[in-house]
């Protein structure tokens, strides 16, 4: 194999929304999404958190897999484990991202650029896109763009059952 240069990786993550009344907080792209004060009780369920061993931040988790894939260092499960007793249990996605960046550096890689597409009907990512990009970029140490889309009411994200994200990342050998 010749010189490595820039490597690309792709990641995906999906989680089901937690049942209403579960007490789970909604974290996406490193941001907490509180229930708006003006929200009706019926609409408040739309801000229920995401099921998962950690905070369920699909954007952060997809980005983690993309970074690790680019450097050929495994995936989120191989680094943080799976289940309630895993190393990553209860962790916030931003903290996991920072740990991944340190892991990349210790293996001779640095993030160069990344993109995350969040797929779901809620919450409305566009209202906080700049914040999401800033939070993820700060955690990773490179520019991270964030886009959002729906599936026109198709599939589990379209039916409001959950949310997903796809990420691509470039890393450089240092």
From Swiss-Prot:
A divalent metal cation binds at residues 13, 15, 61. The record marks 53, 150 as: Transition state stabilizer. One of its GO terms (biological process) is isopentenyl diphosphate biosynthetic process, methylerythritol 4-phosphate pathway. Binds 1 divalent metal cation per subunit. Its cofactor is a divalent metal cation. GO terms for molecular function: 2-C-methyl-D-erythritol 2,4-cyclodiphosphate synthase activity; metal ion binding. Keywords: Isoprene biosynthesis, Lyase, Metal-binding. PROSITE patterns: ISPF. It catalyses: 4-CDP-2-C-methyl-D-erythritol 2-phosphate = 2-C-methyl-D-erythritol 2,4-cyclic diphosphate + CMP. 4-CDP-2-C-methyl-D-erythritol 2-phosphate binds at residues 13-15, 75-77, 149-152, 156, 159. Belongs to the IspF family. This is 2-C-methyl-D-erythritol 2,4-cyclodiphosphate synthase. It comes from Bifidobacterium longum (strain NCC 2705). The lineage of its organism: Bacteria, Bacillati, Actinomycetota, Actinomycetes, Bifidobacteriales.
